[in-house]
Protein backbone atom coordinates (compact mmCIF):
# COMPACT_ATOMS: atom_id res chain seq x y z
CA UNK A 1 0.00 0.00 0.00
CA UNK A 2 1.41 3.34 -0.99
CA UNK A 3 1.54 6.07 1.61
CA UNK A 4 1.12 9.71 0.75
CA UNK A 5 4.42 11.39 1.49
CA UNK A 6 4.55 15.06 2.38
CA UNK A 7 7.23 16.57 0.21
CA UNK A 8 6.29 20.22 0.68
CA UNK A 9 8.99 22.51 2.04
CA UNK A 10 8.27 24.93 4.87
CA UNK A 11 7.61 27.96 2.68
CA UNK A 12 4.98 29.56 0.49
CA UNK A 13 5.35 31.09 -2.93
CA UNK A 14 4.24 34.45 -1.56
CA UNK A 15 6.50 34.37 1.49
CA UNK A 16 8.03 37.81 2.04
CA UNK A 17 10.29 37.22 5.06
CA UNK A 18 13.11 34.93 6.09
CA UNK A 19 13.36 33.29 8.53
CA UNK A 20 9.83 32.41 9.52
CA UNK A 21 10.57 32.72 13.26
CA UNK A 22 11.36 36.24 14.41
CA UNK A 23 13.22 34.94 17.47
CA UNK A 24 16.04 33.68 15.25
CA UNK A 25 16.91 37.29 14.48
CA UNK A 26 17.34 38.14 18.19
CA UNK A 27 20.62 37.60 19.98
CA UNK A 28 20.48 34.67 22.42
CA UNK A 29 21.73 36.92 25.26
CA UNK A 30 19.04 39.56 24.74
CA UNK A 31 17.00 40.39 27.90
CA UNK A 32 13.77 39.60 26.07
CA UNK A 33 14.28 35.87 26.65
CA UNK A 34 14.59 36.46 30.38
CA UNK A 35 11.31 38.36 30.26
CA UNK A 36 9.51 35.36 28.81
CA UNK A 37 11.09 33.02 31.32
CA UNK A 38 9.60 34.92 34.26
CA UNK A 39 6.38 36.36 32.86
CA UNK A 40 4.64 36.83 29.56
CA UNK A 41 4.68 40.62 29.09
CA UNK A 42 7.04 43.02 30.80
CA UNK A 43 9.22 45.94 29.87
CA UNK A 44 12.76 46.21 31.22
CA UNK A 45 13.84 49.24 29.23
CA UNK A 46 13.48 52.81 30.39
CA UNK A 47 10.43 53.63 28.27
CA UNK A 48 7.64 55.07 30.41
CA UNK A 49 5.56 56.76 27.72
CA UNK A 50 2.66 54.61 26.55
CA UNK A 51 2.85 56.17 23.09
CA UNK A 52 6.54 55.26 22.92
CA UNK A 53 5.72 51.65 23.87
CA UNK A 54 3.07 51.56 21.14
CA UNK A 55 5.65 52.76 18.64
CA UNK A 56 8.13 50.11 19.76
CA UNK A 57 5.50 47.38 19.37
CA UNK A 58 5.17 48.39 15.71
CA UNK A 59 8.87 48.75 14.89
CA UNK A 60 11.03 46.76 17.35
CA UNK A 61 11.37 43.02 16.62
CA UNK A 62 11.85 42.25 20.31
CA UNK A 63 8.43 43.66 21.07
CA UNK A 64 7.02 41.86 18.03
CA UNK A 65 8.36 38.64 19.50
CA UNK A 66 6.56 39.32 22.76
CA UNK A 67 3.35 40.00 20.84
CA UNK A 68 3.79 36.76 18.83
CA UNK A 69 3.19 38.79 15.67
CA UNK A 70 -0.24 39.93 16.80
CA UNK A 71 -1.47 43.43 16.06
CA UNK A 72 0.27 46.07 18.12
CA UNK A 73 -1.98 47.48 20.89
CA UNK A 74 -2.64 51.19 21.05
CA UNK A 75 -1.45 53.40 23.88
CA UNK A 76 -5.04 53.55 25.18
CA UNK A 77 -5.04 49.76 25.52
CA UNK A 78 -1.89 49.89 27.62
CA UNK A 79 -3.40 52.66 29.72
CA UNK A 80 -6.61 50.73 30.32
CA UNK A 81 -4.64 47.62 31.29
CA UNK A 82 -2.55 49.52 33.82
CA UNK A 83 -5.46 51.52 35.20
CA UNK A 84 -8.10 48.78 35.36
CA UNK A 85 -6.13 45.58 35.88
CA UNK A 86 -2.79 46.40 37.50
CA UNK A 87 -3.76 49.06 40.04
CA UNK A 88 -5.09 46.56 42.57
CA UNK A 89 -2.94 43.56 41.64
CA UNK A 90 0.49 45.09 41.04
CA UNK A 91 1.65 44.41 44.62
CA UNK A 92 0.91 40.70 44.24
CA UNK A 93 2.57 40.61 40.82
CA UNK A 94 5.66 42.24 42.32
CA UNK A 95 5.74 39.66 45.11
CA UNK A 96 5.34 36.78 42.64
CA UNK A 97 8.24 38.07 40.55
CA UNK A 98 10.37 38.45 43.66
CA UNK A 99 9.46 34.96 44.87
CA UNK A 100 10.67 33.49 41.57
CA UNK A 101 13.89 35.52 41.45
CA UNK A 102 14.74 35.11 45.14
CA UNK A 103 14.35 31.32 44.97
CA UNK A 104 16.53 31.07 41.84
CA UNK A 105 19.23 33.44 43.08
CA UNK A 106 19.13 32.38 46.78
CA UNK A 107 18.60 35.93 48.03
CA UNK A 108 19.41 36.61 51.69
CA UNK A 109 16.43 38.37 53.31
CA UNK A 110 18.08 38.72 56.72
CA UNK A 111 20.43 41.52 55.62
CA UNK A 112 18.31 44.43 54.41
CA UNK A 113 19.70 47.77 53.24
CA UNK A 114 17.22 50.61 53.70
CA UNK A 115 17.36 54.02 52.09
CA UNK A 116 15.06 56.67 50.70
CA UNK A 117 15.07 59.26 47.97
CA UNK A 118 12.79 62.11 46.94
CA UNK A 119 11.25 61.90 43.47
CA UNK A 120 9.63 64.96 41.95
CA UNK A 121 5.88 64.62 41.52
CA UNK A 122 4.00 65.23 38.29
CA UNK A 123 2.61 68.51 39.59
CA UNK A 124 2.93 72.16 38.68
CA UNK A 125 5.71 73.91 40.52
CA UNK A 126 3.94 76.96 41.95
CA UNK A 127 0.75 75.30 43.19
CA UNK A 128 1.62 75.06 46.86
CA UNK A 129 -0.79 75.31 49.76
CA UNK A 130 0.78 75.90 53.18
CA UNK A 131 -1.05 74.57 56.20
CA UNK A 132 0.36 77.16 58.61
CA UNK A 133 -0.66 80.01 56.32
CA UNK A 134 -4.20 78.64 56.20
CA UNK A 135 -4.35 78.43 60.00
CA UNK A 136 -3.03 81.99 60.34
CA UNK A 137 -5.41 83.41 57.75
CA UNK A 138 -8.31 81.51 59.27
CA UNK A 139 -7.65 83.22 62.60
CA UNK A 140 -7.72 86.58 60.83
CA UNK A 141 -11.13 85.67 59.40
CA UNK A 142 -12.32 84.83 62.93
CA UNK A 143 -11.31 88.32 64.10
CA UNK A 144 -13.08 89.95 61.15
CA UNK A 145 -16.24 87.93 61.83
CA UNK A 146 -16.23 89.14 65.44
CA UNK A 147 -15.99 92.76 64.29
CA UNK A 148 -18.77 92.18 61.77
CA UNK A 149 -21.05 90.63 64.42
CA UNK A 150 -20.50 93.70 66.62
CA UNK A 151 -21.51 95.92 63.70
CA UNK A 152 -24.58 93.78 62.98
CA UNK A 153 -25.73 93.90 66.59
CA UNK A 154 -25.14 97.64 66.88
CA UNK A 155 -26.38 98.92 63.51
CA UNK A 156 -29.23 96.57 62.61
CA UNK A 157 -30.20 93.86 65.07
CA UNK A 158 -30.15 96.11 68.14
CA UNK A 159 -33.21 97.94 66.88
CA UNK A 160 -35.00 94.64 66.34
CA UNK A 161 -34.29 93.25 69.80
CA UNK A 162 -31.95 90.56 68.44
CA UNK A 163 -28.31 89.80 69.17
CA UNK A 164 -25.80 87.43 67.58
CA UNK A 165 -23.34 85.63 69.84
CA UNK A 166 -19.60 86.11 69.36
CA UNK A 167 -17.02 83.35 69.82
CA UNK A 168 -13.25 82.98 69.75
CA UNK A 169 -13.47 80.47 66.90
CA UNK A 170 -16.32 79.95 64.47
CA UNK A 171 -17.41 76.66 62.99
CA UNK A 172 -18.77 76.59 59.45
CA UNK A 173 -22.15 75.34 60.63
CA UNK A 174 -22.39 78.16 63.17
CA UNK A 175 -21.71 80.80 60.49
CA UNK A 176 -24.45 79.25 58.36
CA UNK A 177 -26.83 79.52 61.33
CA UNK A 178 -25.86 83.18 61.83
CA UNK A 179 -26.63 83.91 58.19
CA UNK A 180 -30.03 82.28 58.50
CA UNK A 181 -30.81 84.13 61.75
CA UNK A 182 -29.75 87.47 60.26
CA UNK A 183 -31.76 86.84 57.11
CA UNK A 184 -34.85 85.84 59.05
CA UNK A 185 -34.54 88.66 61.60
CA UNK A 186 -34.14 91.40 59.01
CA UNK A 187 -36.54 89.92 56.47
CA UNK A 188 -33.97 89.89 53.68
CA UNK A 189 -34.86 88.38 50.31
CA UNK A 190 -31.84 87.39 48.20
CA UNK A 191 -33.90 87.72 45.04
CA UNK A 192 -34.21 91.46 45.73
CA UNK A 193 -30.46 92.04 46.16
CA UNK A 194 -29.03 94.72 43.86
CA UNK A 195 -25.60 94.93 42.23
CA UNK A 196 -23.74 96.87 39.58
CA UNK A 197 -23.54 100.54 38.70
CA UNK A 198 -26.42 102.79 39.62
CA UNK A 199 -27.56 100.65 42.53
CA UNK A 200 -26.90 101.29 46.18
CA UNK A 201 -26.80 98.28 48.48
CA UNK A 202 -28.55 98.48 51.80
CA UNK A 203 -26.55 98.04 54.97
CA UNK A 204 -28.33 94.73 55.62
CA UNK A 205 -27.31 93.40 52.19
CA UNK A 206 -23.69 94.54 52.66
CA UNK A 207 -23.36 92.83 56.03
CA UNK A 208 -25.07 89.67 54.82
CA UNK A 209 -22.87 89.34 51.73
CA UNK A 210 -19.73 90.14 53.73
CA UNK A 211 -20.53 87.30 56.13
CA UNK A 212 -21.21 85.05 53.15
CA UNK A 213 -17.73 85.85 51.80
CA UNK A 214 -16.15 84.96 55.15
CA UNK A 215 -18.05 81.66 55.17
CA UNK A 216 -16.74 80.81 51.71
CA UNK A 217 -13.15 81.52 52.75
CA UNK A 218 -13.54 79.46 55.94
CA UNK A 219 -14.71 76.51 53.85
CA UNK A 220 -11.67 76.90 51.60
CA UNK A 221 -9.24 76.99 54.54
CA UNK A 222 -10.97 74.03 56.20
CA UNK A 223 -10.61 72.01 53.02
CA UNK A 224 -6.90 72.89 52.70
CA UNK A 225 -6.21 71.93 56.32
CA UNK A 226 -8.14 68.67 55.96
CA UNK A 227 -6.16 67.69 52.85
CA UNK A 228 -2.85 68.40 54.60
CA UNK A 229 -3.88 66.30 57.59
CA UNK A 230 -1.75 65.83 60.69
CA UNK A 231 1.29 64.36 58.91
CA UNK A 232 2.34 67.17 56.58
CA UNK A 233 2.36 70.95 56.27
CA UNK A 234 1.81 71.46 52.54
CA UNK A 235 0.38 69.95 49.38
CA UNK A 236 0.11 70.72 45.68
CA UNK A 237 -3.16 71.78 44.06
CA UNK A 238 -2.49 69.66 40.97
CA UNK A 239 -1.44 66.57 42.94
CA UNK A 240 -2.97 66.72 46.38
CA UNK A 241 -0.97 63.73 47.67
CA UNK A 242 2.37 65.37 46.86
CA UNK A 243 4.23 67.35 49.52
CA UNK A 244 6.62 70.23 48.90
CA UNK A 245 10.17 69.18 49.78
CA UNK A 246 13.68 70.41 49.22
CA UNK A 247 15.37 68.28 46.56
CA UNK A 248 19.12 67.87 46.14
CA UNK A 249 18.90 68.76 42.45
CA UNK A 250 17.71 72.36 42.34
CA UNK A 251 17.39 72.83 38.57
CA UNK A 252 15.26 75.96 39.08
CA UNK A 253 18.25 77.69 40.67
CA UNK A 254 16.27 79.58 43.32
CA UNK A 255 16.38 77.10 46.21
CA UNK A 256 12.65 76.59 45.81
CA UNK A 257 10.67 73.72 47.32
CA UNK A 258 9.25 71.29 44.79
CA UNK A 259 6.30 68.86 45.01
CA UNK A 260 7.70 65.38 45.60
CA UNK A 261 7.20 61.95 47.15
CA UNK A 262 9.57 60.16 49.51
CA UNK A 263 10.37 56.75 48.01
CA UNK A 264 11.56 54.17 50.55
CA UNK A 265 13.24 50.93 49.47
CA UNK A 266 14.51 47.80 51.22
CA UNK A 267 17.29 46.16 49.19
CA UNK A 268 18.33 42.51 49.58
CA UNK A 269 21.30 41.24 47.54
CA UNK A 270 20.90 44.11 45.05
CA UNK A 271 17.18 43.41 44.49
CA UNK A 272 14.33 45.67 45.59
CA UNK A 273 12.46 43.59 48.18
CA UNK A 274 9.96 46.23 49.36
CA UNK A 275 9.05 49.75 48.31
CA UNK A 276 6.90 52.30 50.08
CA UNK A 277 5.83 55.87 49.35
CA UNK A 278 5.33 58.42 52.12
CA UNK A 279 4.54 62.16 52.27
CA UNK A 280 7.17 62.86 54.97
CA UNK A 281 10.25 64.86 54.06
CA UNK A 282 12.22 63.05 56.79
CA UNK A 283 13.19 59.37 56.60
CA UNK A 284 12.89 58.87 60.35
CA UNK A 285 9.12 58.32 60.33
CA UNK A 286 9.30 56.01 57.30
CA UNK A 287 11.31 53.21 58.93
CA UNK A 288 8.54 51.46 60.86
CA UNK A 289 5.97 51.40 57.98
CA UNK A 290 8.61 50.02 55.59
CA UNK A 291 9.73 47.23 57.95
CA UNK A 292 6.11 46.36 58.74
CA UNK A 293 5.44 46.02 55.02
CA UNK A 294 8.51 43.79 54.76
CA UNK A 295 7.09 41.59 57.51
CA UNK A 296 3.69 41.35 55.78
CA UNK A 297 5.36 40.43 52.50
CA UNK A 298 7.88 37.83 53.68
CA UNK A 299 6.51 36.69 57.03
CA UNK A 300 9.43 37.84 59.18
CA UNK A 301 11.47 40.88 60.15
CA UNK A 302 15.01 41.30 58.79
CA UNK A 303 17.69 40.38 61.31
CA UNK A 304 20.06 43.14 60.22
CA UNK A 305 18.32 46.30 58.97
CA UNK A 306 21.10 48.65 57.84
CA UNK A 307 20.31 52.33 57.30
CA UNK A 308 21.94 55.75 57.36
CA UNK A 309 21.73 58.42 60.05
CA UNK A 310 18.33 59.60 58.84
CA UNK A 311 16.69 56.56 60.46
CA UNK A 312 18.49 56.46 63.82
CA UNK A 313 15.99 57.61 66.43
CA UNK A 314 14.95 56.48 69.90
CA UNK A 315 11.62 55.18 68.59
CA UNK A 316 13.22 53.16 65.79
CA UNK A 317 15.85 51.64 68.09
CA UNK A 318 13.24 50.47 70.59
CA UNK A 319 11.12 49.17 67.72
CA UNK A 320 14.07 47.02 66.63
CA UNK A 321 14.45 45.69 70.17
CA UNK A 322 10.77 44.75 70.32
CA UNK A 323 10.94 42.74 67.08
CA UNK A 324 14.31 41.03 67.49
CA UNK A 325 16.28 43.16 65.03
CA UNK A 326 19.87 44.25 65.54
CA UNK A 327 20.66 47.97 65.65
CA UNK A 328 22.67 48.85 62.56
CA UNK A 329 21.18 52.28 61.83
CA UNK A 330 23.48 55.24 62.31
CA UNK A 331 22.43 58.09 64.59
CA UNK A 332 22.65 61.80 63.90
CA UNK A 333 26.15 62.48 65.27
CA UNK A 334 27.65 59.16 64.15
CA UNK A 335 30.09 60.64 61.64
CA UNK A 336 31.34 63.24 64.11
CA UNK A 337 31.68 60.59 66.80
CA UNK A 338 33.82 58.36 64.59
CA UNK A 339 35.91 60.88 62.62
CA UNK A 340 36.33 63.92 64.88
CA UNK A 341 38.68 62.95 67.69
CA UNK A 342 38.53 66.41 69.25
CA UNK A 343 34.75 66.24 69.51
CA UNK A 344 34.74 62.63 70.72
CA UNK A 345 37.24 63.28 73.52
CA UNK A 346 35.96 66.73 74.47
CA UNK A 347 36.04 66.76 78.32
CA UNK A 348 33.20 69.29 78.48
CA UNK A 349 30.66 66.96 76.87
CA UNK A 350 28.25 65.54 79.40
CA UNK A 351 28.83 61.96 78.23
CA UNK A 352 32.54 62.34 79.08
CA UNK A 353 31.95 63.57 82.63
CA UNK A 354 33.19 61.32 85.42
CA UNK A 355 31.01 60.07 88.27
CA UNK A 356 31.60 59.96 91.99
CA UNK A 357 30.71 57.12 94.35
CA UNK A 358 27.11 58.31 94.56
CA UNK A 359 26.69 58.39 90.77
CA UNK A 360 26.74 62.19 90.48
CA UNK A 361 28.25 63.72 87.34
CA UNK A 362 31.51 65.62 87.96
CA UNK A 363 32.64 68.36 85.56
CA UNK A 364 36.35 69.04 84.73
CA UNK A 365 36.39 71.72 87.47
CA UNK A 366 35.29 69.17 90.07
CA UNK A 367 31.78 70.55 90.53
CA UNK A 368 28.81 68.21 90.98
CA UNK A 369 25.80 68.21 88.70
CA UNK A 370 22.71 67.66 90.82
CA UNK A 371 19.53 66.07 89.51
CA UNK A 372 16.69 68.58 89.20
CA UNK A 373 13.78 66.89 87.47
CA UNK A 374 12.65 64.50 84.75
CA UNK A 375 10.77 65.92 81.78
CA UNK A 376 9.01 64.10 78.91
CA UNK A 377 10.11 64.45 75.30
CA UNK A 378 7.42 65.56 72.87
CA UNK A 379 6.22 63.44 69.96
CA UNK A 380 7.64 60.23 71.39
CA UNK A 381 5.86 56.91 71.05
CA UNK A 382 7.60 55.07 73.89
CA UNK A 383 7.32 57.76 76.56
CA UNK A 384 10.93 58.89 76.39
CA UNK A 385 12.06 61.19 79.19
CA UNK A 386 15.13 63.32 79.82
CA UNK A 387 16.92 63.95 83.11
CA UNK A 388 17.79 67.57 83.81
CA UNK A 389 20.97 68.22 85.83
CA UNK A 390 22.34 71.55 87.10
CA UNK A 391 25.85 72.40 88.26
CA UNK A 392 26.29 73.35 91.91
CA UNK A 393 28.17 76.54 91.06
CA UNK A 394 29.80 77.87 87.90
CA UNK A 395 30.91 81.11 89.55
CA UNK A 396 34.59 81.84 89.03
CA UNK A 397 35.12 78.68 86.97
CA UNK A 398 38.36 78.86 84.90
CA UNK A 399 36.79 76.63 82.22
CA UNK A 400 33.82 78.94 81.62
CA UNK A 401 34.76 79.87 78.05
CA UNK A 402 35.33 76.26 76.97
CA UNK A 403 32.43 74.74 78.91
CA UNK A 404 29.46 77.11 78.48
CA UNK A 405 30.49 80.58 77.24
CA UNK A 406 26.93 81.82 76.61
CA UNK A 407 25.38 80.68 79.90
CA UNK A 408 24.68 83.44 82.45
CA UNK A 409 23.70 81.03 85.22
CA UNK A 410 24.85 77.60 86.31
CA UNK A 411 25.17 75.15 83.44
CA UNK A 412 22.33 72.68 82.96
CA UNK A 413 22.48 69.50 80.90
CA UNK A 414 19.85 67.10 79.64
CA UNK A 415 20.64 63.41 79.39
CA UNK A 416 18.94 60.12 78.69
CA UNK A 417 21.01 57.25 80.00
CA UNK A 418 19.09 54.68 77.95
CA UNK A 419 19.61 56.56 74.68
CA UNK A 420 23.31 57.03 75.49
CA UNK A 421 23.66 53.28 76.03
CA UNK A 422 21.85 52.59 72.75
CA UNK A 423 24.22 54.91 70.87
CA UNK A 424 27.20 53.08 72.34
CA UNK A 425 25.71 49.74 71.25
CA UNK A 426 25.20 51.09 67.73
CA UNK A 427 28.80 52.33 67.65
CA UNK A 428 30.06 48.89 68.67
CA UNK A 429 27.93 47.20 66.01
CA UNK A 430 28.89 49.50 63.15
CA UNK A 431 32.61 49.65 63.95
CA UNK A 432 32.95 45.86 64.06
CA UNK A 433 34.13 43.92 60.99
CA UNK A 434 30.59 42.75 60.30
CA UNK A 435 29.28 46.30 60.70
CA UNK A 436 31.92 47.72 58.37
CA UNK A 437 30.96 45.21 55.68
CA UNK A 438 27.28 46.04 56.11
CA UNK A 439 27.96 49.78 55.87
CA UNK A 440 29.98 49.25 52.71
CA UNK A 441 27.26 47.08 51.16
CA UNK A 442 24.58 49.60 52.06
CA UNK A 443 26.43 52.32 50.18
CA UNK A 444 26.87 50.05 47.17
CA UNK A 445 23.44 48.45 47.00
CA UNK A 446 20.94 51.04 48.22
CA UNK A 447 22.70 54.09 46.79
CA UNK A 448 23.52 52.12 43.65
CA UNK A 449 19.85 51.28 43.13
CA UNK A 450 18.87 54.95 43.08
CA UNK A 451 21.87 55.70 40.87
CA UNK A 452 20.68 53.20 38.27
CA UNK A 453 17.09 54.46 38.37
CA UNK A 454 17.80 58.19 38.38
CA UNK A 455 20.92 58.49 36.26
CA UNK A 456 21.29 55.37 34.13
CA UNK A 457 17.56 55.19 33.32
CA UNK A 458 16.97 58.97 33.59
CA UNK A 459 13.95 58.40 35.85
CA UNK A 460 13.83 61.59 37.92
CA UNK A 461 10.19 62.66 37.70
CA UNK A 462 6.94 60.76 38.10
CA UNK A 463 4.46 60.39 35.25
CA UNK A 464 1.30 59.77 37.29
CA UNK A 465 -0.57 61.74 39.93
CA UNK A 466 -2.07 60.57 43.20
CA UNK A 467 -0.46 58.32 45.80
CA UNK A 468 -2.19 55.17 44.53
CA UNK A 469 -1.03 55.76 40.96
CA UNK A 470 2.45 56.70 42.15
CA UNK A 471 2.75 53.39 44.03
CA UNK A 472 1.59 51.60 40.88
CA UNK A 473 4.20 53.35 38.75
CA UNK A 474 7.07 52.80 41.18
CA UNK A 475 6.13 49.14 41.64
CA UNK A 476 6.24 48.67 37.86
CA UNK A 477 9.66 50.32 37.85
CA UNK A 478 10.79 47.97 40.64
CA UNK A 479 9.57 44.93 38.68
CA UNK A 480 11.62 46.02 35.68
CA UNK A 481 14.66 46.78 37.84
CA UNK A 482 14.64 43.35 39.51
CA UNK A 483 14.15 41.51 36.22
CA UNK A 484 16.95 43.46 34.57
CA UNK A 485 19.23 42.79 37.54
CA UNK A 486 18.39 39.08 37.41
CA UNK A 487 19.08 38.95 33.66
CA UNK A 488 22.47 40.67 34.04
CA UNK A 489 23.47 38.28 36.83
CA UNK A 490 22.55 35.29 34.68
CA UNK A 491 24.57 36.64 31.77
CA UNK A 492 27.61 37.21 34.01
CA UNK A 493 27.35 33.69 35.39
CA UNK A 494 27.08 32.19 31.91
CA UNK A 495 30.07 34.23 30.75
CA UNK A 496 32.13 33.16 33.77
CA UNK A 497 31.25 29.51 33.16
CA UNK A 498 32.22 29.85 29.49
CA UNK A 499 35.55 31.47 30.39
CA UNK A 500 36.23 28.81 33.00
CA UNK A 501 35.60 26.01 30.49
CA UNK A 502 37.78 27.72 27.89
CA UNK A 503 40.59 28.18 30.40
CA UNK A 504 40.36 24.51 31.39
CA UNK A 505 40.72 23.39 27.76
CA UNK A 506 43.71 25.67 27.27
CA UNK A 507 45.56 24.44 30.36
CA UNK A 508 44.99 20.67 29.95
CA UNK A 509 48.32 18.87 29.38
CA UNK A 510 48.93 17.09 26.10
CA UNK A 511 49.06 13.30 26.53
CA UNK A 512 51.37 11.49 24.11
CA UNK A 513 50.82 7.83 23.36
Which residues make up each language-model segment?
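Cysteine-cluster motifs in flexible loop/terminal segments that predominantly coordinate metals
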Residues: 360-414
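Polybasic low-complexity intrinsically disordered regions
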Residues: 58, 73, 78-322, 332, ...
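DNA-recognition alpha helix
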Residues: 52-65
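Conserved small/polar residues in nucleotide/adenosyl-binding loops
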Residues: 503-510
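Basic, low-complexity segments
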Residues: 2-44
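Phosphate/diphosphate-binding loops
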Residues: 318-319, 327-367
